Amino acid sequence: MSLIVTRFAPSPTGYLHIGGLRTAIFNYLFARANQGKFFLRIEDTDLSRNSIEAANAIIEAFKWVGLEHDGEILYQSKRFGIYKEYIQKLLDEDKAYYCYMSKDELDALREEQKARKETPRYDNRYRDFKGTPPKGIEPVVRIKVPQNEIIGFNDGVKGEVKVNTNELDDFIIARSDGTPTYNFVVTIDDALMGITDVIRGDDHLSNTPKQIVLYKALNFKIPNFFHVPMILNEEGQKLSKRHGATNVMDYQEMGYLKEALVNFLARLGWSCHDKEVFSMQELLKWFDPKDLNSSPSCFSWHKLNWLNAHYLKNQSAQRLLELLKPFNFSDLSHLNPTQLDRLLDALKERSQTLKELALKIDEVLIAPVEYEEKVFKKLNQALVMPLLEKFKLELNKANFNDESVLENAMHKIIEEEKIKAGSFMQPLRLALLGKGGGIGLKEALFILGKTESVKRIEEFLKN
């Protein structure tokens, strides 16, 4: 089997979005699964729209999710000399030609064609032109598209695709200022980089016949193509910013783990063994672009949150602390290692994102300044206050290094007072955490420690 070589080739005119990252992941997995090469190419030939910040953001996103590319990043803006050579080669071989048609002439032609209910297109008037070039017009360069031929290719996702070259006009490969066009530079670079397999969005499907024309004109080997359907929202519409079409790095800020995001995106449009959770090793073992779906996939926040919660629960306390560093939350330095582990173990089971986990740390460690009103109103204060006073005395005697001792202290109150567990547990939870829900009470007592637990009960009794 020949070496698999893939690439991801974004334009730095905006930040890397979720659909682009999915395409990059598919290319990465296919190359790595076959011990091949995966390249990153920045398509920055549109000098007026390029953004250095956007290019850097693409690189930053790659680093975050762990997509390591081979070799140096290839920037198309540094390769204009190469493109110029190949344009001249096509001109010299009479496979391309200068077109002197002005914009006004082209616009007029299109209007005439529309009036005749024809598809607007260039009419090849300069294809075999041998006369004196008109003055004052900087020509474009057009490729001579073979006439009355069928261009066919077997797309790995779409199946057999056929286009009659009569549907194509002699498209431009170099603008009047000499800069090459998109389809031309993509073809040149894919060929010179030895790309064997092109996995990209199906919005590029219409470009493929034009690129095949160029491959053939230059006697380049044509790669395999896989055109992946777009990602839709759950209503079947194009992704909007609200529905997930946002900068990839925003997902890091929202508290998603890279493992969860890669797993989620790899499953958008690809399936294997009815599994949902895939480690990187499993993705590399099972991924094959031939298994990509031909219909669009739907972005589901519910599924992403479920996956992220799964990965969050399986993180060690040490890694969680590293992952939590970008988020603001209470100081943890007063907790001993056992308390810290207990805090993170308790909260990661109740959190879907790192951001949510950071908020829940505050909910435990910051003493309540007010109490959940609907829970507070239901309390029988005449019963509750003596119970908490009695429990406070038990806590002062208790060994806070043993959670079972704390649990026994709570059950002792319930048994001695012959009351239902909720009659005591609910007000105790309100005193410690300020609300009716949250982590278990024995965990809360253990994490807060004796001094803080007693202090919070005393503050509650004052209210």
From Swiss-Prot:
Q: What does this protein do?
A: Catalyzes the attachment of glutamate to tRNA(Glu) in a two-step reaction: glutamate is first activated by ATP to form Glu-AMP and then transferred to the acceptor end of tRNA(Glu).
List localization entries.
Cytoplasm
Q: Which domain of life is it from?
A: Bacteria
Q: Which reaction(s) are listed as its catalytic activity?
A: tRNA(Glu) + L-glutamate + ATP = L-glutamyl-tRNA(Glu) + AMP + diphosphate
Q: Which gene encodes it?
A: gltX1
Residue positions annotated to bind ATP are: K241
- Quaternary structure annotation from Swiss-Prot or TrEMBL: Monomer.
Q: Where is this motif: 'KMSKS' region?
A: 238-242
Task: Identify the PROSITE patterns for this entry.
Answer: AA_TRNA_LIGASE_I (PS00178)
Short motif 'HIGH' region, span: 10-20
Q: Name one GO biological process term.
A: glutamyl-tRNA aminoacylation
Instruction: Please identify the protein, giving its name as recorded.
Output: Glutamate--tRNA ligase 1
The record's section on HAMAP family has: Glu_tRNA_synth_type1
UniProt-recorded Gene Ontology molecular function terms? ATP binding; glutamate-tRNA ligase activity; tRNA binding; zinc ion binding
In Pfam terms, one family for this protein is Anticodon_2
Keywords (A to Z) from UniProt:
Aminoacyl-tRNA synthetase, ATP-binding, Cytoplasm, Ligase, Nucleotide-binding, Protein biosynthesis
User: Belongs to which family?
Assistant: Belongs to the class-I aminoacyl-tRNA synthetase family. Glutamate--tRNA ligase type 1 subfamily.
